[in-house]
Amino acid sequence: MNTNDFDFELPEELIAQTPLEQRDASKLLVIDPVTREMTDTHFDHIIDQLNPGDALVMNNTRVLPARLYGEKTDTHGHVEFLLLKNTQGDQWEVLAKPAKRLKVGAKVSFGDGRLTATVTEELDHGGRIVEFSYNGIFLEVLESLGEMPLPPYIHEKLEDRDRYQTVYAKENGSAAAPTAGLHFTPELLQKIEAKGVKLVYLTLHVGLGTFRPVSVDNVDEHEMHSEFYTLSQEAADTLNSVKAAGGRIVAVGTTSIRTLETIGNKYDGQLQADSGWTNIFIKPGYQFTVVDAFSTNFHLPKSTLVMLVSAFAGREFVLEAYKHAIQERYRFFSFGDAMFVTRPSEK
């Protein structure tokens, strides 16, 4: 498989720069790979795609305001950090700019010294391990000094940082939002639950690798980034019961899919309480063990996310659906519109 097999022309003006005023007013393209039907609707009608007895699985990770601007304490040169993951205690892996000036022992000050960082290790590609010093609670300091790490294709300033969080965001740790969940409102979730659909939450902390382009021609040579996930016993029990009763597991977004499939692969299609790191790469040829349907946003050309959707619904049909979405002026990427995909079934 060649990376170019997942390429398509996307007019730049279709890349959504800001969220819509109303979360669930976004458009929704419903696609069925069996009948090859495509239906244009709006996201608040996703409830029509869900049946009593189904489970809707959402990722409740919360995006940290992980972009910090500071200065070196010796030269006062400007420094930018992007927090990637907490390695232990007050140590973090960060992406640093300009990295070449930040050798082991270098000190960086943020917010007039309210937060300082010392470089303890140099990594590849501008990565550094740093140890933070501060007074009080780290997350509170970060909330006051940090900025939301918006994706590189969004150039507008975000007026309300809550719009880059899902309404059910709870567990701190992501460098990017699980954007398929941005469309849900508390009212819509209430209606879905009232219909008899189980609402189930898991956690996968989204890393920046989610935006990393595939830089190799041969898809099989691409190395996926690792991300940390957690599924509780209560959630696993609910999902196993839904499956056993003939209900569908409907995932919200690729992060939920990757978590569920990682755990399902470990336990022969069953779900158990589990946490750990996953670098699962779902591409055409992959056999799904857990997920029956899902919603997702429209993704970047040649990305692993387009490959995942293609594994589920077939590459040619997915590219047809993307062509339709472009013709109908759907909005793309993080603040864009959504797609609902039902799984080809032989039942």
UniProtKB/Swiss-Prot annotation:
GO terms for molecular function: S-adenosylmethionine:tRNA ribosyltransferase-isomerase activity. Its main location: cytoplasm. The keyword S-adenosyl-L-methionine applies. It is found in: Cytoplasm. It comes from the Bacteria. Pathway: tRNA modification; tRNA-queuosine biosynthesis. It catalyses: 7-aminomethyl-7-carbaguanosine(34) in tRNA + S-adenosyl-L-methionine = epoxyqueuosine(34) in tRNA + adenine + L-methionine + 2 H(+). GO terms for cellular component: cytoplasm. One of its GO terms (biological process) is queuosine biosynthetic process. Its EC number is 2.4.99.17. Keywords: Cytoplasm, Queuosine biosynthesis, S-adenosyl-L-methionine, Transferase. The keyword S-adenosyl-L-methionine applies. It is an enzyme of class 2 (transferase). InterPro entries: QueA, QueA_dom1, QueA_dom2, QueA_sf. Belongs to the QueA family. Transfers and isomerizes the ribose moiety from AdoMet to the 7-aminomethyl group of 7-deazaguanine (preQ1-tRNA) to give epoxyqueuosine (oQ-tRNA). Monomer. This is S-adenosylmethionine:tRNA ribosyltransferase-isomerase. The lineage of its organism: Bacteria, Bacillati, Bacillota, Bacilli, Lactobacillales.
